Amino acid sequence: MVAYKNIALLALTFTIASVESLSIVGARPYIDKALSVFDIKTPNSQSEKPEIILTFAGPDDKPVPGDSPIVQCEASVPQLLNLQSVVIDPNPPLRGENLTFVAKGVLSQDIEDGAYVEVDVRYGFIKLLHQTFDLCEEITKIDLECPISKGQQVIEKKVEIPAEVPPGKYIVSARAYTKDDIFITCLSAMVEFPPL
């Protein structure tokens, strides 16, 4: 499904709007710095390459073709999106540089208004975000809109990785569902940025 291809893209860029509402007493400056990895408004600068960690949480996870850090979780469960590839450039992502995603897949059913996605963002062991989003509202950020027609989908998006990304391991997972709670897809990505 394109909507979840958006989640492949949104798995790293999707939390932009919702992350702004996160507030933890006394930890806000630290959280803001960690969350800045998802902010696309930061200026460019030189940086070190992060390490992509291709470890899979469970026996039911499988890598998505394209040599990216994205894996399909719950792969044995029927999903409406057959994600064929996700290519990122540069690979691995670099601080202070633009990152281009190209995702390709086949959606087996139209996705209509009311679809939603559950997103978790972690910084190491710290859960920064657990929130449910309106999928159709979020995909407008990557120039798509509902209904999304079944069939072949290709999504390309360019985002900026802030130069101020704090070092550490970032884990993003997203599970998308139709308005009738039919499983669209589950994607997860893990990227580790080295110390500056």
From Swiss-Prot:
SMART domains: ML. It comes from the Eukaryota. GO terms for cellular component: fungal-type vacuole lumen. Keywords: Lipid transport, Signal, Transport. One of its GO terms (biological process) is intracellular sterol transport. One of its GO terms (molecular function) is sterol binding. Pfam families: E1_DerP2_DerF2. Catalyzes the intermembrane transfer of phosphatidylglycerol and phosphatidylinositol. Belongs to the NPC2 family. PANTHER family: NIEMANN PICK TYPE C2 PROTEIN NPC2-RELATED, PHOSPHATIDYLGLYCEROL_PHOSPHATIDYLINOSITOL TRANSFER PROTEIN. This is Phosphatidylglycerol/phosphatidylinositol transfer protein. The lineage of its organism: Eukaryota, Fungi, Dikarya, Ascomycota, Saccharomycotina. The gene is NPC2.
